[in-house]
């Protein structure tokens, strides 16, 4: 089983890295990009000892407690069972 976790800054939180990437894109000719927000992506291989519901609960807690800063970041968890 594979868990995918996407961590992004909450709306309203300033994103200087995203702004820098947006500025660089415009500078080198990538026009038409309105905004860039940066984030983090994690792939977590699970050992199969948990069913899908347990795995989601386990990874959600891990994402909240370890992978993100809940004050300024949101996260999304996807579980792939193949």
What are these regions (language model features)?
Residues 1-11, 42-43:
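Short glycine-/aliphatic-rich beta-strand segments at the starts of folded cytosolic domains
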Residues 12-28:
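Short amphipathic alpha-helix segments
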Residues 53-82:
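C-terminal structural segments of small proteins and small subunits
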Residues 6-10, 47-49, 80:
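Solvent-exposed residues in well-ordered beta-strands and their adjoining turns
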Residues 14-16, 50-57:
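Short, conserved charged micro-motifs
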Residues 37-41:
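Short Gly/Ser/Thr- and Asp/Glu-enriched loop/turn motifs at secondary-structure junctions
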Residues 29-34:
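Short beta-strand/turn micro-motifs at beta-sheet edges
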Residues 43-45, 76:
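Short, conserved beta-strand segments within well-ordered enzyme catalytic domains
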